[in-house]
From Swiss-Prot:
Its main location: cytoplasm. Residues 321-327 are annotated as: Nuclear localization signal. Residues 93-170 form the Winged helix Storkhead-box1 domain. GO terms for cellular component: cell cortex; cytoplasm; nucleus. PANTHER family: FI21431P1 (PTHR22437:SF0), WINGED HELIX DOMAIN-CONTAINING PROTEIN (PTHR22437). Residues 285-295 are annotated as: Bi-partite nuclear localization signal. This is Stork-head box protein ham-1. Probable transcription factor. Required for asymmetric cell division in neuroblasts, perhaps acting by regulating spindle positioning and myosin polarization, and thus the position of the cleavage plane. Required to produce daughter cell size asymmetry in neuroblasts undergoing asymmetric cell division, usually giving rise to one precursor cell and one apoptotic cell. Positively modulates expression of the serine/threonine kinase pig-1/MELK during asymmetric division of the Q.a neuroblast. It is found in: Cytoplasm, Cell cortex; Nucleus; Cytoplasm. Keywords: Cytoplasm, Nucleus. Pfam families: Stork_head (PF10264). It comes from Caenorhabditis elegans. The lineage of its organism: Eukaryota, Metazoa, Ecdysozoa, Nematoda, Chromadorea. One of its GO terms (molecular function) is DNA-binding transcription activator activity, RNA polymerase II-specific.
Length: 414
């Protein structure tokens, strides 16, 4: 077994094993180069010498693959490092690198890196990536990149979707995440719900001394029995009470003709309904009250302007003070009740039609009234009073009647 020394340039590493694992991980990503990936699986870690010399060993054929990859400038260093030299450990002879670089491997690596970063892997993007991240490779032209991609498409290493290119990842590639093992579906039983399997697991034994129980096992069994009496076991072990189905009040008969319900179950209908005499007026009054809003209530519309808003304190009083509307008193009028022989007047009589309503008459003038219809031979239901102060006789009978039966009522202005 021969040894190979890889001289790395980068930050000072304290653990050479991590540097070796990073070196293998970077080269395993080139899964399209099967010889290099198989060589990474075969080599072993031998040691590390500071500041950055890595020693590996393996079969001679696999180490030769690493030398060829370094010679063709496709061998990748560990993350954060660069490979300055590579050679055998015996004489540490340096391997000369060729000027020819396989463009297929470089383009495959560029497409894989663009896919991993979530960038569009177009022809122009691939060319820019090679020119920026591969200084040892002369920037290829767009036609050379297109020809190389066409050859990769024919071999199946790269596939195209619209104008974007993607690397065909095999199933055993380290870039593909490992598939999760299918979880076995468990069947929910009564023991899972009641917790009996957790409290008292069943123990099966095939040994011949099955009935022999040691003292330690007895203590373990007592502990299990005490756990079974815990509150969770008592809660879950309660059985469900059987639900009693109440018989229906009206049993359903299937197959028979539908029978009409008995007359006693039907509600009685009043053929001659009666209502109170003022029902119509009451309904109209309620409808009028519903349609016409109350006096003083105005419909307030919302406005988007802040000038029209009125802000009240947070603690509003239960009832806001309201002012009653001042009403003007209606003028009094004189009237005489029916079936009355006496004169009745709330306000003084008005003889002059030019006077205004509600004006006060002279308090010095006294008026005398007498019922004329009482002394006439005609039968009247109402009374008629005349003022004797300024009355003139219109008939021949009235002066005699007034002279003999003058029974007046003197009413003075109050």
């Amino acid at each position: 077994m021969t040894y190979l020394a890889v001289v790395l340039n980068g930050p000072k590493a304290k653990n050479g094993r991590k540097v070796f694992d990073s070196f293998l991980e970077q080269n395993r990503q080139m899964f399209w180069n099967r010889e290099l990936t198989s060589a990474c699986e075969s080599i072993t870690y031998m040691g590390f010498m500071r500041p950055g010399t890595l020693f590996v060993s393996g079969p001679a054929s696999q180490l030769t693959v690493l030398k060829d990859a370094w010679a063709r400038r496709i061998l990748k260093p560990a993350m954060g490092y660069t490979i300055t030299s590579l050679g055998d450990l015996g004489a540490i002879q340096q391997v000369e690198q060729m000027h020819f670089v396989p463009l297929g491997d470089v383009i495959c690596d560029a497409v894989a890196q663009l896919n991993r970063q979530g960038l569009a892997a177009t022809e122009q993007a691939i060319r820019q990536y090679v020119a920026r991240h591969c200084p040892h490779v002369a920037p290829p032209g767009i036609e050379m990149v297109r020809q190389t991609i066409t050859s990769l498409l024919s071999t199946g290493f790269v596939y195209k979707m619209a104008d974007h290119y993607f690397v065909s990842v095999p199933t055993n590639s380290p870039m593909r995440p490992p598939a999760k093992a299918a979880t076995k579906t468990t069947k929910t039983t009564v023991e899972c719900q009641t917790g009996a399997s957790m409290m008292c697991p069943q123990q099966t034994s095939t040994s011949s001394d099955e009935h022999v129980i040691e003292p330690a096992k007895k203590d373990h069994k007592k502990c299990q029995n005490s756990n079974r009496r815990s509150i969770f076991a008592r809660l879950f072990s309660r059985g469900m009470k059987p639900q009693t189905i109440m018989p229906s009040a009206s049993p359903i008969h299937v197959g028979g003709p539908p029978t009409p319900p008995p007359a006693a179950m039907l509600p009685t209908k009043n053929k001659y309904p009666t209502y109170h005499h003022d029902l119509n007026e009451e309904c109209q009054r309620k409808a009028r009250r519903r349609n016409h809003p109350r006096r003083g209530e105005t419909q307030k519309l919302l406005s988007s302007s802040s000038e029209c808003l009125k802000y009240y304190p947070v603690d509003m009083p239960e009832t806001r003070p309201t002012r009653r509307r001042a009403r003007m008193a209606s003028p009094l009028r004189s009237s005489t009740p029916n079936n009355s022989d006496s004169a009745y007047s709330i306000s003084p009589p008005h003889t002059d039609s030019n006077e205004e309503a509600g004006s006060i008459s002279d308090s010095e003038i006294n008026h005398t009234y007498i019922n004329i219809n009482k002394f006439r031979r005609q039968n009247f239901d109402s009374t008629q009073f005349e003022d004797l102060t300024g009355a003139t006789a219109t008939t021949s009978e009235e002066p005699e009647i007034l002279g003999r039966h003058i029974r007046g009522v003197l009413i003075s202005n109050l």
